[in-house]
Amino acid sequence: MLPALIIFCATYLFLAGAEVPFLKLDRPGGAVAGAAAMVVFRVLTPEQVYRDAISWDTIVLLLGMMVLSSVMARAGIFRWVGWVALRRAHSPTSLLAAVVVVAGALSALLVNDTICVMCTPIVVAMVEAANLPPLPFLLAVAFASNAGSVATLTGNPQNMLIGTLSKIPYAHFTAALALPAILSLACVHLVLRLAFREQLRERRRLDVDVPAPELHRGNAIACAGALVFVVAGFVLGYDLAWTALVGSALLLVVTRGPPREIFAQVDGVLLLFFAGLFVVTHGVAQAGIAERIFRGIEPVLGSDALQQTIRFGGFTVAACQLVSNVPFVLLAGQWVPHFADPHLGWLGLALFSTLAGNLTPVASVANLIVLELGGRHGKVPFFQFVKVGAAATFLPLVVGCACLLVERRLGLLPGP
């Protein structure tokens, strides 16, 4: 157990962003190094790593969704959607609402991190053309992509993990969390509108003459068809990973352009990060460490399902600030089956771990992407981000959690 414990602590130290002298490991590097150490120190055998540790379903699902998003970006769909939003916005506040709705909806259909990569440069160009302050709109992309992604199993990486671990059907998951996600988006818009009311107070009508971006109609139609095919497959209960992979493969066949350029936009580092985390977490489980951690927090959580949901939600928000949401969900996924109501526990974990990403700049990859891509407009001070992020975290959490518990009380939650 001791080697596994040391490797676990060292790995999660890197996941928390700690800097170790003479070591330049970042989060993905720390995860891969931890995975290798689990094998070197015989916590796991190579056969266990290949056969048991890595969730290939999650890796394949993430790969398929990233390829699908990449093809849609090359077709010009995201630029065209941004142009339509800018043309139809009549004021700064209506443009802010459009950014929240578009980022949230696209993140529910695709993967929020990818949406941030694709949409942030478009939003920057939009606000420059409209001569508007960029900060409210950049935060709208980050916060709304997190909030909107709550709604589906494919909205973000941690939801994909929850889907793999819990076996909750896509349709059941969305039926339970669609309304909390919509209400969370409304809360995000309200928070941003109040926080930046001085900058958005202009009453002038937006009249921006921006030429329409190039839209490859044939490829766009193929992308729309593939997206309908994939979502329909999800709803009908087909295997998520292979449905996404088949949909993306069909797009590669029917669209123009070399696949190499599409694959170049796939985040291979993220896939390696996931693989490393899977191995480290499996080693922790094999050594019994995860079970001991749960025994330590179990008395605090209580035995009632309602108590467990609320208290574990608070614990989740705090833990996600330390190690980010994906590593925490991998660890917490071993505890939820022991809850009084595991089905509610999985849904609560998805809600809390995702919305926790709005609290600090490092709490979610989506935040880091938006701040990096929008960085030429100046850095966002940490405490200014937290000031707005706290409201964009806790208000949606209170509203979303209350909605989820009311659904459970009324018997509206689909069964596991």
Question: Where do the protein language model's features map onto the residues?
Answer:
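Re-entrant/interfacial helical elements at transmembrane boundaries that shape
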Residues: 81-82, 114-126, 138, 152-166, ...
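Alpha-helical transmembrane segments of multi-pass membrane proteins, especially transporters
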Residues: 27, 31, 35, 66, ...
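A small-residue-rich subset of transmembrane alpha-helices
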Residues: 273-274, 349-372, 392-400
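Hydrophobic transmembrane alpha-helices of multi-pass small-molecule transporters
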Residues: 1-70, 80, 179-185, 189-286, ...
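Transmembrane alpha-helix interface/packing and boundary motifs in multi-pass membrane proteins
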Residues: 13-25, 102-111, 142-154, 232-237, ...
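Membrane-interface elements of multi-pass transporters and channels
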Residues: 44, 75, 79, 88, ...
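Membrane-core helix-loop-helix motifs of multi-pass transport proteins
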Residues: 126-198, 205-210, 341, 346, ...
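Membrane-embedded alpha-helical segments and adjacent helix-loop junctions characteristic
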Residues: 47-135, 268-341
